[in-house]
């Protein structure tokens, strides 16, 4: 199972780095920061489906 450590998030600003991750909501997030901010917003209900685009 793919995991991402989001303990340092949420962050106010994310970089434009492009390293896509696919969330359990079938949405592609452009990088770890954007994904982890979404995880924080979801109160932990969002998880990582896999690395790369959905």
Swiss-Prot record:
Pfam families: Kazal_1
Cystine pairings recorded for this chain: 6-36, 14-33, 22-54
Keyword GTP-binding: no
Main location, first listed in the record: secreted
Gene3D superfamilies: 3.30.60.30
GO molecular function: serine-type endopeptidase inhibitor activity
Domain of life: Eukaryota
Localization per Swiss-Prot or TrEMBL: Secreted
Domain Kazal-like: start-end pairs: 4-54
UniProt-listed SUPFAM superfamilies: Kazal-type serine protease inhibitors (SSF100895)
Residues with attached carbohydrate: 43
Keywords: Disulfide bond, Glycoprotein, Protease inhibitor, Repeat, Secreted, Serine protease inhibitor
Site (Reactive bond 3): 16-17
Any one Gene Ontology cellular component term annotated for this protein: extracellular region
PROSITE patterns in UniProt: KAZAL_1 (PS00282), KAZAL_2 (PS51465)
Record's comment describing the protein's domains: Avian ovomucoid consists of three homologous, tandem Kazal family inhibitory domains.
Protein name: Ovomucoid
């Amino acid at each position: 199972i793919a995991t991402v450590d989001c303990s340092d998030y949420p962050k106010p600003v994310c970089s434009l780095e492009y390293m896509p991750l696919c969330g359990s909501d079938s949405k592609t997030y452009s990088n770890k920061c954007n994904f982890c901010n979404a995880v924080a917003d979801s109160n932990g209900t969002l998880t990582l489906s896999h690395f790369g685009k959905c």
